[in-house]
Amino acid sequence: MPKIKTRRSAAKRFSVTGSGKFKRRKQNLRHILTKKNAKRRMRLGQSATVDSTNEKAVRRMMPYA
């Protein structure tokens, strides 16, 4: 049985925490930042965890994580 390939796109976007959850970056922080206030931009800069609904899909894309 051959090894399962890791989806490289997922590996670049997600990282595994010590507890086994997946960490991700928040969206909306690339451009059009002038209309977003400082508080919102700071919140968007923090990392978030992957929702339980999507965790199964991410785990399937990264079999060795």
From Swiss-Prot:
Keywords: Ribonucleoprotein, Ribosomal protein. The keyword Transcription does not apply. GO terms for biological process: translation. InterPro entries: Ribosomal_bL35, Ribosomal_bL35-like, Ribosomal_bL35_CS, Ribosomal_bL35_sf. One of its GO terms (cellular component) is cytosolic large ribosomal subunit. GO terms for molecular function: structural constituent of ribosome. It comes from the Bacteria. Residues 1-11 have a biased composition (Basic residues). Disulfide bonds: none annotated. The keyword Electron transport does not apply. Residues 1-24, 41-65 are annotated as: Disordered. NCBIfam families: rpmI_bact. Belongs to the bacterial ribosomal protein bL35 family. This is Large ribosomal subunit protein bL35. It comes from Nitratidesulfovibrio vulgaris (strain DSM 19637 / Miyazaki F) (Desulfovibrio vulgaris).
